[in-house]
Amino acid sequence: MGRIIGIDLGTTNSCVAVLDGGKARVIENAEGDRTTPSVIAYTQDGETLVGQPAKRQAVTNPTNTVFAIKRLIGRRFEDEEVQRDIGIMPFKIVKADNGDAWVEAGGEKRAAPQISAEILKKMKKTAEDFLGEAVTEAVITVPAYFNDSQRQATKDAGRIAGLEVKRIINEPTAAALAYGMDKNRGENIVAVYDLGGGTFDLSIIEIDEVEGEHTFEVLATNGDTHLGGEDFDNRVINYLVAEFKKDQGLDLKTDPLAMQRVKEAAEKAKIELSSAQSTEVNLPYVTADATGPKHMNVKLTRAKLESLVEDLVTKSIEPLKRALADADLSVSDINDIILVGGQTRMPLVQKTVAEFFGKEPRKDVNPDEAVAVGAAIQGGVLAGDVKDVLLLDVSPLSLGIETMGSVMTALIEKNTTIPTKKSQTFSTAEDNQSAVTIHVLQGERKRSSDNKSLGQFNLEGIRPAQRGTPQIEVTFDVDADGILHVSAKDKDTGKEQKITIQASSGLSDEEVEQMIRDAEAHAEDDKKFEELVATRNQADAMVHGTRKQIEEAGDALPSEDKEAIEAAVVDLETAIKSDKKDEIEAKTQALAEKSQKLMEIAQAKAQQGSADAGEQQQSAKQDDDVVDAEFEEVKDDK
């Protein structure tokens, strides 16, 4: 078995590590750097450049130089943040035939996993040059808050790069592995604050020593899949462009070459201000007009930078609070804070985190390399080179299906330890229903349309029967990569249908954030909706039951009573279609009152049936050949 390498596939930079002599080692690339810019360029002569060479030529080839591709992976073109990125990216983001967000560069339309694969190929080659052998297996990291589609798309990128992805591991969990492997202090609860180039994650992880086994258990995770260093850069870019327009009266946003230079200068200024109090952005000949060349000269202080990005830093605090609440912990329960991701080098970020937790974050973790190191350790665990390490990660969002009344019924709750498998039995909503549609959802809301649709499939060939009779077993299986597999089985016929949720779309920043925020802010709305659905279902059952009783009563029910009851049934059916709970309840009550005669007929028939049964029993007692039998009453749970 060959070595399993660990790859941190980052938005801004990527990193590769491998277990070497029992220790995880970060590998330097061909340029001698320990991290590689996640930049890909397609040149005029058909060459593909990756990393520093691609970044160096970006100024002269902005429309064919792709960066921050991780922000598009597993996403739909129509997603709000994709639309937002279209306005600021110099390269062209286009809509693929399947609705995904693709990139047009080098005269071709390319999928995000395809472009990401170029970075992974570079990481693979870097490892092969160091090890002197072929590498075919890898552990790749993703943000903890990546959804099913984004994880699938990342695995696809690995496959395109010629790698068998042995495991997808969450970035904060990988960082905790890197930090905790050499710590033998018993129970230790750490908060991993991971603010990278394009994503933000927060995980609460318990590191413990149990009977000689190192356990890393994720207690809760939260985050924002569209918040990172790129957003900080964009604030600086917008400020520089606005200052230049104020000074020169020219809008640089119409000039791709100028914008690429401004982007590089903004990133450089942001980094410099982590150690300096002020810096100057000097870009001679940044553009020109009829009067001649124009130069940019803008002074930027740390205080100004902090005022530009303060709300972005504050935005990261809400997920912290939610993760602590989900883990049922308070700030005082956290022993250590680990900062991961290049953006955490910013003093304002460090200060904000320290103020929230009431203690300074640890300084002994390299924010750029910890994730790749953790991935390499996990690779060692999978290869059997690292013993006595148990990693318990979680599913970041609830997973379920749409049930009667457009309700999201969760089979796997958020923050459930993975891998996990859960089955639940459902039934049909109509008489003689021969097929059911299994609609798979991800999110925290009760109403199915308020959650993210991951996919749907049909289970056909169900034997005709009364509603509520067929037994359909739905099974959700989340593997160690956090990828969902769903199956539905008709217990009667044994027919089964399976689906692995395909990477057809990604969760938008707005969708993911809103799912949990809305679930909290609209708890009252959700409760009212649940009550409305319960009332509707109860009324629907009454309509169905009443119609059946009318049929069974036959001629025993006077025609005038029958007409009155049928009119009440129609009234209730009309009410069920509305959103007025009180009206549905009133019409249900009206039908119950009108159906009094039906009840009397049903009771009379039941009494007659009991009398007949009594006579048969008496007759049976007189028979010498008596057989005792046990019976069990089975009630349908509708």
From Swiss-Prot:
Residues 602-638 are annotated as: Disordered. Residues 605-620 have a biased composition (Polar residues). The modification Phosphothreonine is found at residue 199. Pfam families: HSP70. PROSITE patterns: HSP70_1, HSP70_2, HSP70_3. Induction: By stress conditions e.g. heat shock. Residues 625-638 have a biased composition (Acidic residues). Keywords: ATP-binding, Chaperone, Nucleotide-binding, Phosphoprotein, Stress response. It comes from the Bacteria. The keyword Nucleotide-binding applies. SUPFAM superfamilies: Actin-like ATPase domain, Heat shock protein 70kD (HSP70), C-terminal subdomain, Heat shock protein 70kD (HSP70), peptide-binding domain. GO terms for molecular function: ATP binding; ATP-dependent protein folding chaperone; unfolded protein binding. Belongs to the heat shock protein 70 family. Acts as a chaperone. NCBIfam families: PRK00290.1, PRK05183.1, prok_dnaK. This is Chaperone protein DnaK. The gene is dnaK.
